[in-house]
């Protein structure tokens, strides 16, 4: 009798596993990614799950080994990720690198910004490559990478489109990316929990809060990797760049009806710096959402003043009124200077009420 019971238990277990595997059949379309029968998301799995979601979204629009070009700077009604910006035009692609692949970027005028950043299936961030050229693509895991190409925002839309159309991908394989479906409620819960940890991170680590969140296991950034930051930043800033490529400053909240200003010395980054205004949840709410060293007017002494709801005559003024009643800031240093990266020079401490 015991023998029969054991065999029955084994059969039941096998049957259960079979049912679970049937529910977890990999999908290639974003519309199939969330399923009530999908795998439950954990904080440990979230970076990979969010990367799968982003990858499937792009693949569902343009397929594999093809670009999805944003012909305009990020509009307020199309922000798939928190803390997007209008610092650059974006192009995205899902590339099958299983049998080798390259991306080719065109010649652009000297002094203009263009970069490509590969993101692996587990949201490990490879270093950027800059300017024109052909760049090899590879990954330490899986078969696909997600590419983020950034192009200088000072180009007109017509100029940007012309350069975007000269970008090309060459790949020896064109298999679609596949991902295991996930259970939506657990995804939303974990994402909310991780985003809520960002203020704690900033309070605890100060100017080093985001260091270690965007790294790769295949280069020198591996030594900076921090598992907690890796999970938190996948929710709070998916697709962010390595420390050597971009340094981010994320603020707390400010009242949206109080004038604030920051006057500071130019950090002299190799590319540029920028301020972007968001609502409390981290989304842009105005078409006038940012100012950068490429667009800001400097003071007579060479410093810069950036203003927030201080009146039209205030230097480099940005609106802050939004439904949440509060605003937040993200300051970005593209190709940060040694003063920023090594000496800890930051602009956020200069933001003060007036």
Task: Label every model-predicted segment.
Residues 4-23:
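Gram-negative bacterial Sec-dependent N-terminal signal peptides
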Residues 24-354:
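A compositional/structural signature for long, glycine/proline-rich flexible linkers
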């Amino acid at each position: 009798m015991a023998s029969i019971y054991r065999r029955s238990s084994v059969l039941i277990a096998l049957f259960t596993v079979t049912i679970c595997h049937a529910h977890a059949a990999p999908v290639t379309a974003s519309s199939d990614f969330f399923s009530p029968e999908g795998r439950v998301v954990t904080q440990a799995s979230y970076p990979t799950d969010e990367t799968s979601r982003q990858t499937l979204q792009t693949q569902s629009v343009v397929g594999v080994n093809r670009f999805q070009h944003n012909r305009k700077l990020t509009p307020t009604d199309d922000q798939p990720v928190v803390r997007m910006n209008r610092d650059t035009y974006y192009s995205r692609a899902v590339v099958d690198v299983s049998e080798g692949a390259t991306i080719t970027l065109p010649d652009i005028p000297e002094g203009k910004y263009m970069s490509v950043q590969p993101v692996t299936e587990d949201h490990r961030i490879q270093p950027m490559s800059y300017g024109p050229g052909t760049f090899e693509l590879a990954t330490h895991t899986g078969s696909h990478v997600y590419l983020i190409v950034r192009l200088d925002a000072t180009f007109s839309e017509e100029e940007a489109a012309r350069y975007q159309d000269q970008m090309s991908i060459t790949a020896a394989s064109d298999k679609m990316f596949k991902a295991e479906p996930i259970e939506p409620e657990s995804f939303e819960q974990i994402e909310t929990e991780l985003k809520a940890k960002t203020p704690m991170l900033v309070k605890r680590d100060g100017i080093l809060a985001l260091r270690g969140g965007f790294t790769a296991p295949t280069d020198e950034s591996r030594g900076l990797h921090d598992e907690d930051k890796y999970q938190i930043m996948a929710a709070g800033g998916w697709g962010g760049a390595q420390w050597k490529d971009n340094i981010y400053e994320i603020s707390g909240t400010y009242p949206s009806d109080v004038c604030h200003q920051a006057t500071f010395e130019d950090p002299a980054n190799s590319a540029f710096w920028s301020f972007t205004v968001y609502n409390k949840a981290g989304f842009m709410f105005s078409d006038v959402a940012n100012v950068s060293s490429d667009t800001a007017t400097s003071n007579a002494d060479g410093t810069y003043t950036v203003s927030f709801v201080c009146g039209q005559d205030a230097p480099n003024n940005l609106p802050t009124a939004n439904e949440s009643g509060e605003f937040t800031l993200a300051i970005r240093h593209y190709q940060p200077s040694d003063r920023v990266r090594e000496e800890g020079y930051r602009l956020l401490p200069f933001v003060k009420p007036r």
